């Protein structure tokens, strides 16, 4: 079965910095815990323990989710030698991306755009391992993501804010489509569960009726 990958993009603080240890780098927080986000179709919160068992190895850092381009950094084993280091804190998941501005023109352009404030958001692609829904039958349900199985990539994005929501509206509409697909999938599951429960209750009622009829027949035997 194909995994349902989801996109989220937010207007969190992204900083361009430089020091002797890491050279030219950017930092940011693509995932924030316990913060309600209006996804357009529903409200979503990522719980504090959502990254407890998440696979953060071999995550790529891209610009605008451009998977056909060369990654600007990579977490590999997510240690001090990685060009992208991902750290889970009390606030969420923070990243540091070491940029090769000496040899990579796109890295130089990104560093400049972040430093100038032209690039102000981060986005991540992931697969949910565990979630729950409240008020699923209402016009604006609530979703809590309790576990994220895998983060595939993190991107710097130019359009992190969607009108009247906190979700990115890219030209292809992917993040919003992803949110809508998640809600539709949850509602289908609820309907399937209700149908299964109704069928189980129907079978129980039928069995009870047969047992009562059998008892009546036995009671009326001479």
Question: For each predicted feature, which ranges?
Answer:
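Terminal short linear interaction segments
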Residues: 184-222
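Signature of dsDNA virion morphogenesis modules
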Residues: 1-184, 200, 215
């Amino acid at each position: 079965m194909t995994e349902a990958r989801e996109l989220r993009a937010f207007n969190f603080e992204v900083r361009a910095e430089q020091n002797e240890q890491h050279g030219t780098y950017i930092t940011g927080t693509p995932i924030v815990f316990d913060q309600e986000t209006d996804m357009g179709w529903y409200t979503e919160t990522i719980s504090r323990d959502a990254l407890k068992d998440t696979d953060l190895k071999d995550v790529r850092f891209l610009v605008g989710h451009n998977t056909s381009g060369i990654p600007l950094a990579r977490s590999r084993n997510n240690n001090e030698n990685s060009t992208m280091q991902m750290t889970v804190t009390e606030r969420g998941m923070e990243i540091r991306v070491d940029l090769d501005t000496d040899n990579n023109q796109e890295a130089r352009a990104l560093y400049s755009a972040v430093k100038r404030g032209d690039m102000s958001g981060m986005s991540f692609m992931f697969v949910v391992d565990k979630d729950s829904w409240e008020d699923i039958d209402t016009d604006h349900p609530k979703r809590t993501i309790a576990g994220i199985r895998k983060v595939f990539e993190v991107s710097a994005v130019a359009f992190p804010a969607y009108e009247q929501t906190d979700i990115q509206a890219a030209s292809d509409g992917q993040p919003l489509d992803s949110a809508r697909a998640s809600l539709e999938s949850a509602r289908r599951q609820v309907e399937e569960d209700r149908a299964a429960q109704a069928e189980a209750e129907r079978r129980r009622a039928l069995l009870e009726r047969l047992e009562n009829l059998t008892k009546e027949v036995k009671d009326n035997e001479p």
